[in-house]
Structure formats: structure tokens, C-alpha cells
């Protein structure tokens, strides 16, 4: 029952500030029984029984929500203790909360005042905790807490940094997202696949094994010689900088100790180049046992026994290890309960695991995985740390622990290892710490150190009961898990310092006790001590109130450790302990007994047996009892009792850092090994690690970090064991280097060892570096490396040349000094300031004339900048930045095009491959560019998609264009000599519009058979049931199949402002409205930033009902035509929070299909109305409607012009920056204005910004002379005719004209059709048919 109540109250506290409803409370109870495997009917009678018990639990509050929908809550004044009296309506409104302090302690492990978590972040933490089983994503979190998404993001980061929550990667709706869960429930979460932020679990290297592997790798190579880098790859230390440095340190160690030799070898291909190699000398002899060879890459530790220990250690301790004073008997809680650690004291479980680990200790990760069944729980890890580090919160049974840092060099994280007192004493003796030091330290150890004492029941009762205990002022956490540290700050000045241990009851016969106390000295300690006193034989026993059988049952885990190899080493050190064993001077015989006081009723039987035959002692080092000290014993005798005081004084507890002692012993041993002096260097740290392994082969090899070494050294200096000297020496390269030396405290400056070390340090490093031997005529194997991974970035030629020139140029020291003086000269600075404030314009002009290719200033990278900002080009037009990459001093788009045209035109007549271009002739088009820059630029752009079509078009059509131009006398014939050839006029001629005429129709290709029609022209039959409008952006369909599907589709005009009234009341036009709304949205999205008008966009969109607009937006999003833009600035501007998708933009880039040209007549009507109504943004609205050819027609006739100066359309009808939101400046950022000649002819129009009236006749197709557009359109006309004749035999010429190309003039269409008939492809006889012979050819 108590477990259930505690479980429910814990779950209520975990719900935090969101609270817990009554239904949820019974879910917790049902979950508790289910996990335990207990069948319990949660009916109303049982709930009535449990309800008041839960409400009486400390820190549980009952709140009620208001009846209105505001959701406000208030604390209930009259608590309904009888569950049956609560109505169903009232149950829905009642919420259970834990008190604020308990909420904060449960979720953040700290009180609200001590925690650094903000209250708003705590709200998020409460919400995440509420969904602790299933997880919650960020969007849901924002909705529930009603906080801004940006703020939530930062607070989640803060909670994650505090290791309170964890992100869990999941796949939701085909996209990877993250759920947020409490860190402690990470493994219990039902949606977990892989945590996003995994803890570093990289391997820790076994250095001995690595050194052995390096030697084996070099030995296995040919001739025993291997490249330095190849050996590194063979031992798999090639992944990170740390691994490479680690490998280099080990190679240096092997070289210094004579296992390998560093040498150089000539490369066979280039004899002047040497490479570093390693030569094998002798196999490596490891100082570790052979049993450790298998454990070089263990994840947590290098000790094989730890894995076995984890398997043997049950989740819960056995029943015998509990005491009757513990609140809940074990029978109620089975070992299968996964959430056990939340409702039982962690420290109890920790102790059992640590005690059974013995000498090796247990690492934090093993404690957590062994006890809680979770991977790595940082909050619990912090709890363990606080139990050890904060003296005020250490329970009695944990005060014997100490921590050591365990290195994980891969991620620089800290893991902590926990030890029992017994294993620490064993370590200290093995490490050679003097017995005097140990005896001085032992009195400071807590009185209950060494074994587990029974649980103090006050730890787990409510704090109300605990407040009655006035002798302890430490707070107990509400969940009864641990004692909390006192508040920070300076402690109050008082003589009586309270201790957190359970109060000791005074005894009646306290004054009659003999003067003896058993200290927690380990068996090995006394065992070594008894060797020097073989004659002494005594039997000491202290009988407590517990029987020996119970004692042996509780402490059966302790077994004596035998360390025979240390017996002889510590004979002398053990002599200090002789007085300990001679304390029986006041005892009449060898056997004596001492009765323990009543207040030690929890004590255990401890026996000390010393005999001649066995040098073994069975000592239960559980407690030493603080009793009064005999006056005869003094500190000078070396007794362990000397510093003990009476229990009435309550001496302050001192923590003993055994690890610090170990480190001090290690450094002093190294000092002795180095003859009393050594230098602090990288080698010293490696030697310390090796010495540590030599002293105790069972430990893992870890390198001490500098901070730890510094702290230990400072302690040794305070104790006047060592001195630290600093020497500044010249390293031989003209630089002073600091060297730190550690010497024995009593070493004199004239000591030979000090002089020797000083001479060694002051030797310049250049002299120390012995040049490695160069091996000649030796074959070395080269490992094949993955070139793709190791390929370096090629340096641009300009930078390379600049580097070379700067290296070769000698540095003039005087000139450098002069420049520095000029920089610092105040008059010079003032003059520069004046010049910058008032520049001379005439001077500026002269400098521009002298250096036309001067380096311009750096350009601000602004994608949507207006054209005026692009002032770094020679022409006023700017180039797009997306298609061809341009730098600030690079070619413009016009220069690129001119270069391609000049090269092709020169090549066609004068020949020459790409390598043998007549660059002298091409350079005449670019007087300011050198040939080297032209060749580089040509090589970089000739393969670009933009210019491939241009090169192909010129190579196919230039001969004919050239002949026509020469016959019209527009061009002179090519000169015989290439030296006289200037390609400039020829390049200009190639840019002119070039019309297809009957003269060159013979060269065009007609389809030869039906396969040619379907394959070459990619004709597909479109199924009738397909929704054609949805397929307009389907890239898989060919031009002809789209044309066939769309040739009868009406042209839809965007709704104007005047149409609003006409459409009102028309209920049947919803589909048309949806289509128009989509067109309007697309046209608004296409408006560029420069001409965007929020008011205009809003007016256009407000014509449609809200549901139509939402549906239109959703349909455009579903069809991937537009996508959302996540930007704070554009949220309130209609049209700015969307952009065209890449798929849509790329569909616009395709060549103009014929079906778009069929709408010219309808577009002409629309254009006419638009110009008459003086509509703004006309071009933006129509540019995506497939009417680009019609606008080009008007432009070609000179009726219109575009307002951006020199803006042009490329071969596809769109500019190269089509991928961006606006399809970029050249394409859509334009408005149509009257051309110059039109405005002059109109007398009424004085301003050229007025819109032009369209021409009276229908627009005809204008063919741009650039690239392959002419050929593409010609092929489309051919293809369309063949396809229509196959589809509709006998169609009349007029029908075909209207069906296909109403935008063409009759003369132009008849010319194409006449050629078609003349070529024998069609017959005209009462209608048009495909020629029978031609049809026969096709089939």
C-alpha cells in the first residue's frame, strides 16, 4: 500500500505545473499494479479507501477549475475526503498538484530558489513530463503552453543543456522530427528509435595493445620497413586529429625505447624526395598480463570482470540485506519493476553494487546501467555525485565513498569511479603511502565508513516527522530519496556543527568502556603489518548485540584480498603499525572481550585474529566506534586512536580524498625513479601513466590531465615535499621557452642531478633533433589510399601565382620599417582623412582612364538588390549570380556570350580544336583582357548548359547566316589571313533575329517512320480521363502530348477589380473562382520585391471568399507549385510568405511549347482591355500564363519596351536565375512601357512611363536569333502537323490553321505547310491527308 501511495504521489509531482486529473490518477494506480503483476480491482470501494491516503501525502494539494471555460484554478478550501461524495461534474474539475517545492525538486532536482531554470522553461518541462510516456513534439508544446515558438526553441535548448530532457528521433509523415521526453524516462519511452543526442561511447585505447600492434604492423611489412602513414592506417588510428597525435606519441615511445627506428626512404619515382618510414628492430614486450589482450576496445572500462559483475548483480538486493526498519517489505515489490529506482533510495542500491565490486570499484555508467536499466541518465549521475561531494547531504552508509576521475580522451567527458574504504586502503598500501599518513587520515573517516548501516527510517518518512528531530537541520526531499544540501553561502559560526547521521543515544555504561576502537583497516593492511611481529599472538573480539550468524549473512560479500607480491616491499612500512597490535598491555590474557554499548545496537560482530601459523586476518572493517580515548595513548605512538574525540563534542566530518593520495604517491615515486628531478613535459605524463600500470597491472592505463597534475603538485609543494623551478631557455630558433622542473624539496642547486637536467634542458632543440637515417636501395610497400577522400582542394591559379611571387620576392627590412612609420605618422593619417572626406573628382577620373581594369570594391551579397547596386560591371546590365558563378573581377554575362560566339565563329572558318584556338583574333573583341584570362574563362564556361545550346546553334546555322549576310552586303567575307580577321562585326551579325525562309528548308529533318515520330519527337497519347490542368507541370509529358491536351483549353483571364460585382451572387462559379484564385496567388507570388505592393495584393486577394482562398492555397501547396517561406518579416504581407518550388520553376525553363502559342488571339484581347484600363502589374500577371511569345512579338515590332535598361531574355524565354523566388530581375521584374519611337509619334504622351496601346493586328510569332529556339519551334510546328494529320485525316487547311497557330500570319503558316506538301509528307485533296507513301514509310 505504501508503495502505491508513494508511486501515485511521485507521478503527481512529475506532472508538474499542469497538474493531474482524477481519472489520470487511477491510470497511475492501474499502471502500478500492472507493472507489478498484481491483479487488483480498482472499483469505487477501493478508490474510496485509497483517496484520503493520497490526499494526506505530504505536499499534495487539491485545486478546482472554474465552471466557465477560462480554465482558471483555485485551491479548494474544503477538501472532499470521501470519494463517494464527489459528483461526476466535480471530478472533471478537480486537479491534484504537488506543492511547488516538490514539483521543482522532482523535475529539476533542486528547489525553485536554487535552480537556474526559468519559470517559463519549467512550464515547458512540466508539459514534457506530463507526456513522459509518449513524448511531445515542439509544435504541440507551443500549443499547450501558449508560448512563442522562438522562445520555446531557446528554452528547450536550455533544458537540454541542463540534461533534464532528451530528444528522440522519430519518423512522422515521411519526415524526421524529434519528440521531447524527460531524460530519466528516455528508455521507457514507447516511440524511441534512436536518441538524437547520444552520449559519447567511444572506445578507450589500451596503450600496451596499440604499441604491440604498431610493432607487429611494421614487422609484417616487406623488409621490416613501413611508411609512417601506412602503419597508422594499419592500426586504425587515422580518423581524427586526436588519434593521429596519440599514434605519434606511441611511435615516439617505441623509437626512444629501441623497439622501432624512425628513418627516411627515397621515393622510387622521384629520387630527390624523402618519405618518413619506420624500421622494425625488436618485438614489443608488454608489461601487462596476457589476459588483458582481449580488452583493448571496451566501451566503458578495460577491466573484464566488470561485465561479469553486471550480469551477476541482481536489480534489487536480496531480502537479508534489508532491515526491519525499512518502510516497505520486499514482498510487495518484485524485482521486475522497472521504475524501482524512482521510489526506493538510489544510494542503497549503489552501495550494494560498489561493495561487491571490491578492489576495482564501479564506474558511474555501470552503476546506472546495472541499477536502473537505462543507458546514461545524467540527472541520476548528478545525484550520485552530490551524494559524495556535498558533505552535508551524504547519508551514513555512503560517507565512505570517494571519486576518481576516469579519462575518456575521445570526447573529454568525465566518468567517475566509486570505491569502498577497504579497496582504497588496499590501493594506498600498494601505492606505498606511508602507514603514518594513513593512520593520521583514518580518524577523519566517518564513524560508519566501510560497510552498510541499516536504513535510517527518518530518511523516508515525511518531512513533518523529520522536523521533530531537532538534532539534524538537513532537509529531506519530498520523495524521500536523499537529503538535500543546505543553502549556499558561508556557514553560521557555531561551535556545535550538526551531523547528518542518525542521532546516537547515550549509554549508561559509556564511562566503563575500555580504551579501544577498531578502525576500518583492510585485511591486507594488517596482514602486512603482522609480518614484523611473528611472536605476537592474540585474539581480540568485540561482541555486539547482533549474532555472528546475522553478521556473516549481511556481510558475506567481503572476502580477504591476498597480495603476496607486496609483502616484502612493505615490511618496513608496517613497523609503524606495531603499537597498534601491542595495545593489549592493559589486558591480562591473550583473549579478551569487550561489550558494546546499547546505542550501538546496529553494530556488527568484528573480530581481529592474529596467529603465528597464518599471516591472515579476518577483520570486518565495518565501523570504528567513537569512544573516549585513554590518557595513556598518545599521538607519538602512531596509534590510530590518537585523533579520536569524545562523541559528546560531535567533531566535524572531514572527507578523505584517497585518489589525491594515490596521485601524490605516484608523482613522488616518479620523482624517486628520476633521481629527484624531472621536467614537466608530454613525455612525463606518458611515463606517469606507464608507472601507474607497472605499480598495479590490474588498473587501466590513463594519462593524467594537466589540471589534475597541477593541483596535486601544488599540494605536494604546500607539504614541502617538492619544489618547482622555472627556467627560461633559448630553443635555438631565437625564441625563449619556459621549462618547468620539479625537484625534491631538499635538493641543492649544486646537486649533480640538477646540473645534469639543467644542461639537458638548456641544449637547443635543433641540436637535440637527430636527423633520421636515410635508407637507400630498400623496397618499401605503399598502401593504396582512397584518393577521393584524400583529394585536396585545388588552389586557384591566381592565388598560387601570388603566393609564388610573394615567396620569391625578397623582403626589404628598411622598406618595411618605412611603411610602418608612415602608417603611424599622425600627419599622414590626418592627410588621409582629409583626402577621404573630400576626394578630387578630376583626379578620380584620370585614375580611371589609366587603369580601366582596376580592382573594384567588394560587392555586398544581396540577392534582391536593385540594378543600380551592381556597379562593378563594365556595362550597365548586371549578370545573374546563380547560373554561372561570378566573382567581383570576373566576366559579365555579355562578355561570356561574346567570347563563345567569337570562338565558334573563328573556329568554323579558320579551324583549330579547343586547344588551338586563334586567341589573337578572339582578343580583338576584348581589348582590355589578356589572352591568359580569356583562355581560362572559355575553359570554365564552354561546358555550361547555358552556352552548349548557343555553340550548337552557331555551328549548325552560322554558315547559312553568314551567306545571307554577305549576300545582303551586311558583312565582308572572311579575310584569308587570320591576323587580319576581327570577329567583332561577325559576332554582332550572329545576334540578329534570323528568320526561317524557304531557302534553307531543305536542310531540316522530317520524320522517316512511325518510330521516329514517337521516339524523336517524344509523342505520347494522353488518356481522355486524365485531368489535363493538373498535368501542366508534369515534366514527364512531352511537348506534343501537352499540346494535344491543351489546344482547346480556354485562356483564363485574371479577375480584375471591376469583375467583383459581376461575380457576386453567382453560386455556380465556385470552380471558376478557385481556378482564378490560384492564378491570382501565382501572379502575386511572382511579383518581385522591388515592385511589390502589399495593398494591391491584398485588394486582389480580397475579391475571393476566405474558403476559396484557403482551398486555392492548399491545392497549390499539394501540387508542389508553391511552398512556404519561413520568415518573420513576411508574415503580414500577402504573397511574401510563399515562393515557387524548384519543380515549378524548372517547368517554366523548358522551351516554349506550341500549345501556349495557340492562345495568342485570346491574349491579344486581354492585353487590349488591360491597356485600356491602365492596369498595373500587367506583365507580372501574365508572365506565367504562357504568353511570353506574344510579348516578345510586341517587343520585336518596337511597340513596347521593358523598363529595365537593356534587360533581355535568353534562349528559353526566361532568365538564368529562374530558381529564385521571383524568377529574378531579368525575367519578371519589368513593366511594359511605350518604346521611344511610339512615344514620339503620340503627341499626347509626354512621359514615356505611360502604357502603350497594343497593335491592331494579331501578334505573329517572333523568332529570336539566339541559340536553338528557332529550330525548336520549327520542329514543334512539323511535329504538330504530323500529329494532327494522324489524328484527324481530311482536316481542312483553315481548321488546321485555327487549331494550331492562330498567332502566325497566314503567309508564315502557308509557307511551312506548302513546304510540308512539297516534301511529299502530305497531300491536299478535299482536305489534308498524310501522303500514302509517306504513311507507308512511317508504318
UniProtKB/Swiss-Prot annotation:
A biological-process GO annotation: 5S class rRNA transcription by RNA polymerase III
Domain of life the protein comes from: Eukaryota
Predominant location: nucleus
Protein localization: Nucleus envelope
Compositional bias per record (Basic and acidic residues), positions renumbered to this chain: 798-826
Pfam family, one: DUF6581
Ranges of compositional bias, category Polar residues: 495-514
Region (Disordered), start-end ranges: 470-515, 791-826
Post-translational modification Phosphoserine, affected residues: 595-596
GO molecular-function terms, A-Z: DNA binding; RNA polymerase III general transcription initiation factor activity
Keyword set, alphabetical order: DNA-binding, Nucleus, Phosphoprotein, Transcription, Transcription regulation
DNA-binding region in chain numbering: 485-497
GO cellular component, one term: transcription factor TFIIIC complex
Subunit text: Component of the TFIIIC complex including sfc1, sfc3, sfc4, sfc6 and sfc7. The subunits are organized in two globular domains, tauA and tauB, connected by a proteolysis-sensitive and flexible linker. Interacts with sfc1, sfc4 and sfc6.
Described purpose of this protein according to its UniProt entry: TFIIIC mediates tRNA and 5S RNA gene activation by binding to intragenic promoter elements. Upstream of the transcription start site, TFIIIC assembles the initiation complex TFIIIB-TFIIIC-tDNA, which is sufficient for RNA polymerase III recruitment and function. Part of the tauB domain of TFIIIC that binds boxB DNA promoter sites of tRNA and similar genes. Cooperates with sfc6 in DNA binding. Localizes to chromatin insulator sequence without recruiting RNA polymerase III and plays a role in nuclear organization.
Name of the protein described by the UniProt record: Transcription factor tau subunit sfc3
Organism field: Schizosaccharomyces pombe (strain 972 / ATCC 24843)
Top-level taxonomy: Eukaryota, Fungi, Dikarya, Ascomycota, Taphrinomycotina
Name of encoding gene: sfc3
Amino acid at each position: 500500500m505504501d508503495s502505491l501511495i508513494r508511486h501515485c504521489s511521485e507521478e503527481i509531482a512529475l506532472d508538474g505545473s499542469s497538474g493531474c486529473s482524477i481519472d489520470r490518477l487511477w491510470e497511475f494506480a492501474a499502471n502500478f499494479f500492472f507493472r507489478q503483476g498484481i491483479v487488483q480491482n480498482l472499483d469505487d470501494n477501493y478508490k474510496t479507501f485509497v483517496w484520503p491516503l493520497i490526499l494526506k501525502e505530504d505536499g499534495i494539494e487539491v485545486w478546482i477549475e472554474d465552471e466557465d471555460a477560462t480554465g482558471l484554478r483555485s485551491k479548494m478550501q474544503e477538501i472532499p475526503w470521501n470519494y463517494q461524495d464527489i459528483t461526476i461534474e466535480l471530478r472533471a474539475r478537480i486537479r491534484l498538484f504537488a506543492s511547488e517545492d516538490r514539483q521543482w525538486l522532482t523535475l529539476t532536482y533542486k528547489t525553485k530558489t536554487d535552480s537556474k531554470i526559468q519559470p517559463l522553461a519549467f512550464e515547458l518541462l512540466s508539459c514534457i513530463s506530463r507526456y513522459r510516456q509518449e513524448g511531445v513534439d515542439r509544435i504541440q508544446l507551443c500549443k499547450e503552453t501558449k508560448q512563442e515558438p522562438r522562445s520555446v526553441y531557446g528554452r528547450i535548448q536550455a533544458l537540454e543543456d541542463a540534461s533534464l530532457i532528451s530528444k528522440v528521433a522519430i519518423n512522422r509523415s515521411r519526415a524526421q522530427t524529434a519528440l521531447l521526453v524527460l531524460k530519466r524516462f528516455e528508455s521507457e519511452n514507447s516511440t524511441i528509435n534512436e536518441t538524437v543526442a547520444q552520449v559519447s561511447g567511444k572506445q578507450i585505447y589500451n596503450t600496451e595493445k596499440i604499441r604491440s600492434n604498431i610493432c607487429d604492423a611494421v614487422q609484417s611489412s616487406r623488409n621490416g620497413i613501413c611508411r609512417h602513414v601506412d602503419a597508422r592506417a594499419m592500426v586504425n588510428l587515422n580518423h581524427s586529429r586526436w588519434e593521429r597525435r596519440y599514434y605519434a606519441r606511441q611511435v615516439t615511445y617505441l623509437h626512444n625505447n629501441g623497439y622501432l627506428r624512425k628513418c627516411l626512404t627515397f621515393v622510387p619515382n622521384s629520387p630527390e624526395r624523402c618519405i618518413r618510414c619506420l624500421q622494425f628492430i625488436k618485438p614489443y614486450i608488454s608489461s601487462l598480463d596476457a589476459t588483458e589482450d582481449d580488452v583493448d576496445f571496451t566501451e566503458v572500462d578495460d577491466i573484464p570482470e566488470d561485465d561479469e559483475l553486471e550480469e551477476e548483480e541482481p536489480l534489487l538486493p536480496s531480502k537479508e540485506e534489508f532491515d526491519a526498519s525499512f518502510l516497505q517489505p520486499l514482498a510487495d515489490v518484485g524485482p521486475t519493476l522497472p521504475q524501482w529506482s524512482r521510489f526506493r533510495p538510489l544510494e542503497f542500491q549503489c552501495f550494494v553494487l560498489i561493495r561487491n565490486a571490491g578492489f576495482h570499484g564501479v564506474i558511474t555508467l555501470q552503476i546506472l546501467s546495472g541499477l536502473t536499466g537505462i543507458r546514461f541518465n545524467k540527472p541520476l549521475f548528478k545525484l550520485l555525485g552530490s551524494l559524495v561531494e556535498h558533505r552535508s547531504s551524504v547519508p551514513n552508509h555512503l560517507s565512505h565513498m570517494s571519486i576518481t576521475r576516469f579519462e575518456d580522451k575521445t570526447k573529454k567527458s568525465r566518468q567517475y569511479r566509486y570505491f569502498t574504504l577497504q579497496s582504497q586502503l588496499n590501493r594506498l598500501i600498494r601505492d606505498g603511502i606511508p602507514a603514518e599518513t594513513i593512520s593520521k587520515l583514518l580518524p577523519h573517516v566517518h564513524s560508519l565508513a566501510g560497510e552498510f548501516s541499516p536504513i535510517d527510517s527518518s530518511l523516508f518518512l515525511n518531512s513533518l516527522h523529520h522536523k521533530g528531530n531537532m538534532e539534524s537541520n538537513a532537509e529531506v526531499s519530498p520523495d524521500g530519496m536523499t537529503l538535500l544540501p543546505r543553502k549556499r553561502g558561508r556557514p553560521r559560526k557555531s561551535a556545535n556543527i550538526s551531523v547528518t547521521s542518525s542521532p546516537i543515544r547515550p549509554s549508561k555504561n559509556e564511562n566503563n568502556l575500555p580504551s579501544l576502537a577498531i578502525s576500518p583497516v583492510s585485511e591486507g593492511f594488517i596482514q602486512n603489518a603482522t609480518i614484523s611481529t611473528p611472536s605476537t599472538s592474540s585474539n581480540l573480539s568485540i561482541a555486539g548485540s547482533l549474532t555472528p550468524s546475522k553478521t556473516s549473512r549481511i556481510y558475506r560479500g567481503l572476502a580477504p584480498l591476498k597480495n603476496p607480491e607486496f609483502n616484502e616491499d612493505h615490511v618496513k612500512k608496517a613497523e609503524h603499525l606495531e603499537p597498534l597490535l601491542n595495545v593489549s598491555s592493559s589486558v591480562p590474557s591473550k583473549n579478551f572481550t569487550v561489550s558494546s554499548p546499547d546505542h550501538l545496537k546496529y553494530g556488527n560482530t568484528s573480530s581481529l585474529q592474529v596467529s603465528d601459523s597464518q599471516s591472515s586476518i579476518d577483520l570486518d572493517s565495518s565501523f570504528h566506534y567513537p569512544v573516549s580515548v585513554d590518557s595513556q595513548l598518545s599521538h607519538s605512538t602512531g596509534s590510530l586512536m590518537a585523533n579520536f574525540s569524545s562523541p559528546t563534542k560531535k567533531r566535524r566530518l572531514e572527507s578523505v580524498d584517497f585518489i589525491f593520495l594515490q596521485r601524490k604517491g605516484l608523482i613522488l615515486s616518479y620523482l624517486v625513479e628520476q633521481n629527484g628531478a624531472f621536467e614537466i613535459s608530454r613525455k612525463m605524463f606518458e611515463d606517469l601513466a606507464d608507472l601507474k600500470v607497472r605499480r598495479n597491472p590490474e588498473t587501466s592505463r590513463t594519462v593524467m590531465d594537466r589540471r589534475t597534475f597541477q593541483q596535486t603538485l601544488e599540494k605536494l609543494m604546500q607539504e614541502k615535499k617538492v619544489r618547482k623551478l622555472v627556467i627560461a631557455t633559448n630553443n635555438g630558433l631565437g625564441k625563449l621557452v619556459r621549462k618547468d622542473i620539479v625537484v625534491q624539496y631538499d635538493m641543492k642547486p649544486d646537486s649533480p642531478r640538477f646540473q645534469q637536467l639543467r644542461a639537458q634542458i638548456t641544449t637547443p632543440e635543433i641540436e637535440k633533433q637527430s636527423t633520421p637515417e636515410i635508407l637507400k636501395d630498400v623496397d618499401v610497400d605503399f598502401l593504396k589510399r582512397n584518393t577521393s577522400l584524400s583529394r585536396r582542394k585545388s588552389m586557384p591559379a591566381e592565388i598560387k601565382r601570388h603566393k609564388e611571387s610573394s615567396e620569391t620576392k625578397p623582403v626589404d627590412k628598411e622598406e618595411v620599417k618605412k611603411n610602418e612609420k608612415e602608417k603611424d605618422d599622425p600627419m599622414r593619417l590626418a592627410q588621409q582623412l582629409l583626402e577621404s572626406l573630400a576626394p578630387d573628382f578630376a583626379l578620380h577620373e584620370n585614375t580611371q582612364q589609366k587603369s580601366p581594369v582596376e580592382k573594384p570594391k567588394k560587392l555586398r551579397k544581396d540577392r534582391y538588390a536593385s540594378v543600380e547596386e551592381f556597379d562593378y560591371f563594365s556595362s550597365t546590365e548586371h549578370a545573374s549570380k546563380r547560373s554561372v558563378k561570378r566573382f567581383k573581377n570576373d566576366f559579365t554575362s555579355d562578355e561570356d556570350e561574346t567570347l563563345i560566339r567569337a570562338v565558334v565563329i573563328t573556329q568554323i572558318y579558320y579551324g583549330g580544336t579547343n586547344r588551338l584556338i586563334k586567341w589573337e583574333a578572339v582578343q580583338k573583341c576584348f581589348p582590355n583582357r589578356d589572352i591568359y584570362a580569356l583562355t581560362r574563362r572559355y575553359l570554365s564556361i564552354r561546358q555550361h548548359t547555358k552556352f552548349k545550346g548557343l555553340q550548337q546553334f552557331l555551328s549548325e546555322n552560322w554558315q547559312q547566316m553568314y551567306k545571307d549576310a554577305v549576300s545582303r552586303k551586311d558583312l565582308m567575307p572572311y579575310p584569308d589571313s587570320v591576323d587580319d580577321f576581327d570577329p567583332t562585326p561577325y559576332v554582332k551579325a550572329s545576334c540578329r533575329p534570323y528568320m526561317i525562309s524557304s531557302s534553307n528548308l531543305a536542310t531540316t529533318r522530317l520524320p522517316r517512320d512511325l518510330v521516329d515520330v514517337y521516339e524523336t519527337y517524344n509523342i505520347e497519347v494522353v488518356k481522355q480521363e486524365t485531368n489535363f490542368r493538373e498535368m501542366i507541370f508534369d515534366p514527364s509529358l512531352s511537348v506534343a502530348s501537352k499540346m494535344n491536351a491543351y489546344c482547346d483549353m480556354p485562356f483564363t483571364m485574371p479577375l480584375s477589380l471591376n469583375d467583383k460585382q459581376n461575380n457576386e451572387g453567382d453560386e455556380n462559379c465556385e470552380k471558376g473562382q478557385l481556378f482564378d484564385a490560384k492564378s491570382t496567388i501565382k501572379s502575386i507570388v511572382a511579383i518581385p520585391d522591388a515592385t511589390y505592393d502589399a495593398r494591391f495584393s491584398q485588394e486582389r486577394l480580397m475579391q475571393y471568399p476566405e474558403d476559396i482562398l484557403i482551398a486555392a492555397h492548399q491545392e497549390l501547396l499539394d501540387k508542389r507549385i508553391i511552398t512556404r517561406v519561413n520568415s518573420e518579416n513576411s508574415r503580414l504581407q500577402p504573397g511574401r510568405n510563399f515562393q515557387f518550388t524548384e519543380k515549378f520553376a524548372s517547368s517554366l525553363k523548358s522551351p516554349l511549347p506550341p500549345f501556349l502559342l495557340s492562345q495568342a488571339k485570346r491574349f491579344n484581347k486581354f492585353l487590349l482591355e488591360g491597356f485600356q484600363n491602365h492596369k498595373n502589374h500587367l506583365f507580372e500577371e501574365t508572365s506565367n500564363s504562357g504568353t511570353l511569345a506574344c510579348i516578345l512579338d510586341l517587343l520585336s515590332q518596337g511597340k513596347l519596351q521593358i523598363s529595365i535598361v537593356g534587360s533581355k531574355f535568353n534562349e528559353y524565354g526566361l532568365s538564368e536565375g529562374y530558381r529564385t523566388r521571383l524568377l529574378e530581375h531579368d525575367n519578371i521584374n519589368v513593366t511594359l512601357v511605350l518604346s521611344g519611337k511610339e512615344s514620339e509619334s503620340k503627341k499626347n504622351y509626354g512621359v514615356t512611363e505611360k502604357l502603350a496601346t497594343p497593335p491592331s493586328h494579331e501578334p505573329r510569332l517572333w523568332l529570336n536569333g539566339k541559340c536553338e529556339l528557332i529550330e525548336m519551334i520549327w520542329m514543334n510546328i512539323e511535329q504538330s502537323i504530323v500529329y494532327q494529320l494522324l489524328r484527324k485525316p481530311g482536316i481542312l487547311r483553315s481548321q488546321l490553321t485555327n487549331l494550331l497557330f492562330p498567332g502566325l500570319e497566314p503567309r508564315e503558316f502557308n509557307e511551312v505547310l506548302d513546304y510540308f506538301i512539297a516534301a511529299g509528307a502530305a497531300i491536299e485533296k478535299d482536305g489534308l491527308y498524310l501522303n500514302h507513301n509517306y504513311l507507308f514509310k512511317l508504318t
